[in-house]
Amino acid sequence: MKVIKHLTLFLLLTVTVNAQNIMTSSPYSMFGIGEIVTGLYGSNSAMGGVSTGMRGTWLLNTENPAGLTGLDTLRLFAETSAFMKSESYQSKNGNSNAFTGNMSAFTLAGRIMPHWYMAAGLTPYSSVGYYFQSTEPLEGSPGSYYTSTFEGYGGLSKVYLTNAFMLGKNLSVGVNVSYIFGNTKLTESQSSISVENRMYTHAFYADFGLQYHRQIGKETAFTIGDVYGYKQRLSIENSIAIVYSSSETEESKRNTTQYLPQFAGIGGSLTYKKCTYALDYDFHQYSSLSSGDSRVKFRDSHKLRLGFDYSPNGYSSSSFWKRSSYKAGVNLSTPYLQINGQKGYAYRFSAGMGLPVTNGRINVALYYDKTQLNNDVYGQSTFGMTVTYTLSELFYKLKL
C-alpha cells in the first residue's frame, strides 16, 4: 500500500498544480467556457475513447460510472494520464502551429464493500489557451499602423466522487458527483494599455450511468450501457481590469449566463475469445452555451465511437508481448462550433498498446484528430500521444 500512498500524494499535488495549465492553443477557445477537453486521458484512448458499454478488471471507467463494478474486487487502483500534441490551425486569416503537453487526469478507485465501488479523481473539463497579434491601419495617420495582442489562458477542472453499485449479478448503476471550477483570463493589449476580462466559474453537478452485463459460455460476454447528464447553470463572477504601464483599475462586470450542456449516450461491447468490439453514440447539447460573438455559435454535437481490442493471452502468459493488448479506434462527429454560419465535420483515428509492468499497466495511444468547417472558414489538425499508467496493489487478503 505504500506505493499507492506515495504515488497518490505526489500525483494529486502535480495534477492540482497543472489543473489550470494550457491544454489547447486554439484561438476559438476564447469563446464560451473554453475548448471542451476530450480524449486526453484514460486507458481506452487508443480505442477511440469508447466507454459507455465498457467494463474490466483493470478498467477505471468513470465516463459510465456503472462500469466501475467490473474492477478486480481484491485490488486498489491509482491511475494517472499525460499527453502531448502538435496542433495546426488553418483559416482564411492565416495559419498557426503549436505544441502542448501536460498531466491530464488522476483517479483512485476500488471496492469499498460487497456490491459497492468508489472512485475519486481530478480531470480537465475545458481549456483556454491562445496567443495571436493583429495589425491594423491607424485612422487619420496614413502609413501608420498599430498592433493588438490577444492572449488567453485558464479553463475549468472537475473534481469528482464516483459511486457504483451492483443491483444483481448482471445489472449495475453509478453516479458521478462533481464540483467544476476554474478561472480564465482574456487579455487585449495595445502599446502601454491592456484590458483583462477575468472570469471565475464554479458549479456542483451529477451524471448517471447504467450497465447490463452478461456472460454467455466461456468465451463470449456482452455489455450494454447508457449515460445521462442534465443541463446545469454555472455560477460565474466576471470582472474587467484596465492595466496601464504603472497602474491597474478593476471593476465588476455584469455576470454572463453559461450552462454545462445536457448529454446522453448509449453503447455496447462484445467480447469473443481474445477480441473486444465496442460501439458508442453520444449526444451533447452544446447549443445551451453562449459565445458572446454573433459570428460564433455553439451547436449540438453527435458523436459515434468505435473501438477494438486484441489481448492474445491475458495476464497469465509468460511472454511480454502476449500479455500486452493491441487497440484501435475511430470517432466521427459533428463539431460543436459554427463560425459565420458554416458547419462541418470531425474525425479521429487512434491506435495503441497496453503494456504490462510490475504492479500495473501502461497504455499508450497515438491519435490523429481533424476538424474542418465548410468553405475553409476554420480547420484544425492534431497529432498527439496519451500515456496512462494504472497502478494496482492488493487491498483485501480475503474476498469479502
Model-derived regions, located:
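Basic side chains
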Residues: 2-5, 327
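Sec-dependent N-terminal signal peptides
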Residues: 4-15
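Subset of outer-membrane beta-barrel
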Residues: 20-400
